[in-house]
Amino acid sequence: MFSKLTPLAETGIPTLSCANAAGRLLHSDSRQIKQGDIFVACPGEYADGRSYIPAAVANGAAFVFWDDDGKFAWNPEWKVPNQGIKDLKHRAGILAAQVYGNVSDGLKFWGVTGTNGKTSITQWLAQAADLLGEKTAIVGTVGNGFWGALEETTHTTPAPVDVQTLLYRFRQQGATVAAMEVSSHGLDQSRVNGVSFRSAIFTNLTRDHLDYHGTMEAYGAIKSRLFYWHGLKHAVINVDDEYGAELAGRLKKDCPDLAVYSYGFSEQADIRIIDFTASSDGIAAVFQTPWGEGKCRTRLLGRFNAQNLAACIALLCANGYPLDNVLDVLAKIRPASGRMDCIMNSGKPLVVVDYAHTPDALEKALATLQEIKPQGAALWCVFGCGGNRDRGKRPLMGAAAVQGADKVVVTSDNPRLENPHDIINDILPAVPAPECVEADRAAAIRYAVEQAAANDIILIAGKGHENYQDVQGVKHRFSDLEIVGQALLTRK
């Protein structure tokens, strides 16, 4: 699907390997360059990396790859070896993969894409694979690294050179498996070019990022690229999702050598959920699969998490792990941070912090909590919408909150460069009788915790694991989990 560069041996640039690359890394950020590193300079979304070649050279770059668009000229005063490459922006990942010796070829590499569920599935796959004897690296929204020791990241899917540098480091640290969240932006901007995916999961397609993609058709087309990836062996598709069902059928026709596994509650699913129960203690489900039938009971919440478990079962069994072992380890997994994260204090309301920031995700989170809500109790929803993003999503979020919750508190999310009150005003037409409107998110959370009855449930939606709030381009320290903890502590 993607063109490949001339082998580096033919260009005179040595291919690095785990044996000879000590300390020599590739970077597309000049600030990360250290003595002996390689700088990759190409136009970006916000800045032109070629403008930072002098800084990279000053920091000790030993070699520079630069985007040759026919207009840019190398300055001979930059006295380091270099090579211009046409269309480097889209080829940088493949270049970096070759320089590092195609390290992803030596990993069981699993990609997860879809609007919702990427983080949970990726984190669960990593936990499960570790319990099955692997050493699993994670690349995703919550962070990059190994389970329990993730380093914060700014993008769900990093820049192409950064992806390959991460994989190189993971291999040096003994990784045998990598699980990656693959965003639509990452696919569209060629960030995963050069990655050798073995297996891929499609979770669902619901409204998000239309400020970027324009239409749902374009959004879906970008997501589907992952399943036509060169060398992909397994495609795991949610057929409870309308687009997923269409994609699964298309792949079976288009890719005869690709093993396609469908999952869900649907009778047509290969990995089918045939029994499901939910309580405040968690969920239990029976799965019918090509590898046999089995039950899994977990502390996770939500019907959608039974679907996510089915995706994990399909991918792990397709990769050769026995079904009984897979079910055993999945019963032990812990939720990803900020994903249906429950904070319980005796005699106080149950508070659930979740990353739900799309109408579909909010609807499902609220439906899950309605199922376990005590009789006579109220379900609260505290939410906002992000600034400088799809405005059309805002009333849809409001409608989802009104439909699913008994009491709605409208507040801010990450307003970014917008006025928080303008964002709230876009939401309010869909929320005719809010319990509270409070632009200060911390105050809104405290209000819900203080006013809710002891047996009520409160969903704090939108930010999940995030430890900042983006206001006027500045990321201020802010954590829903911390604010909830403080509010519960001081609740009378």
UniProtKB/Swiss-Prot annotation:
Cofactor(s) of this protein: Mg(2+)
Main location: cytoplasm
N6-carboxylysine PTM sites in chain numbering: K223
Signal peptide span: none
UniProt-annotated binding residues for meso-2,6-diaminopimelate: R389, D413, N414, P415, R416, G462, E466
Motif Meso-diaminopimelate recognition motif boundaries: 413-416
Places the protein is found: Cytoplasm
Stated name of the protein: UDP-N-acetylmuramoyl-L-alanyl-D-glutamate--2,6-diaminopimelate ligase
Record organism: Neisseria meningitidis serogroup A / serotype 4A (strain DSM 15465 / Z2491)
